[in-house]
């Protein structure tokens, strides 16, 4: 169950709070969502998987919630979207028999290395697989959720730990050992809180001050991160610091976004099909 469905706080926005916040945004509606702040060029470049994990980590404790059973599949969905955005994979063109996003296979476009171990490992699996598989099947295979013993070789192991090590190398996390009564656990507390706050502010702005009410006008990576953060059940961490009025608006706008029909949105001009295919897979699971 995701944040949007198990959240106990009031999530219905009153007309007065909606009107109040929208009036604050009038001067920002015409701003292009792709326009970055001047300092953005100096920001650390993170993959979608690193961003999702960073949003899900408890800052001081250095681990994700034990009750979060969504983030594993969310990270695998992020891998597929990241590969598509880097021009390595794509969905096969629609045909009369295969029009739906979830019916179309994931095809290899380029096997050139990305420099990221997880991405390159996934790329090797996709290249070596015959027959080709759908987005939903790939998420299941990469997560290890398959009854076919011959398909277990495609499971990506220790994904969170490997992503966390990347974030340690980028100076955002550190590594510690914590004792939990019967066992020791490696944790990764956040050391660069500025980077995490920047990431959270980016998502908050995308559904508040920079809201454009049209996914086709949103920055592709921001749209992908919203979809993945929702599917990974980490949006609560992003919006919890907002005032009640802004929290309600942010959650409801995100809810409206992820409840759009992926089949319709995926066919629009310049749409990134993989984002909508991943969302469709999560909606079905």
Curated annotation (Swiss-Prot):
GO terms for biological process: Golgi organization; positive regulation of protein secretion; protein targeting to Golgi apparatus. Residues 176-187 are annotated as: Beta-hairpin required for oligomerization. Residues 1-43 are annotated as: Disordered. It is a peripheral membrane protein. GO terms for cellular component: cytosol; Golgi apparatus; Golgi cisterna; Golgi cisterna membrane; trans-Golgi network. Disulfide bonds: none annotated. Expressed in a subset of tissues tested with higher expression in salivary gland, small intestine and skin (at protein level). Residues 10-43 have a biased composition (Basic and acidic residues). The modification Phosphoserine is found at residue 112. It holds the Pfam family GPP34. Keywords: Golgi apparatus, Lipid-binding, Membrane, Phosphoprotein. The keyword Membrane applies. The keyword Secreted does not apply. GO terms for molecular function: cargo adaptor activity; phosphatidylinositol-4-phosphate binding. Homooligomer. Does not interact MYO18; differs from GOLPH3 by its inability to interact with MYO18. May interact with ARF1. Belongs to the GOLPH3/VPS74 family. Phosphatidylinositol-4-phosphate-binding protein that may antagonize the action of GOLPH3 which is required for the process of vesicle budding at the Golgi and anterograde transport to the plasma membrane. This is Golgi phosphoprotein 3-like. It comes from Mus musculus. The gene is Golph3l.
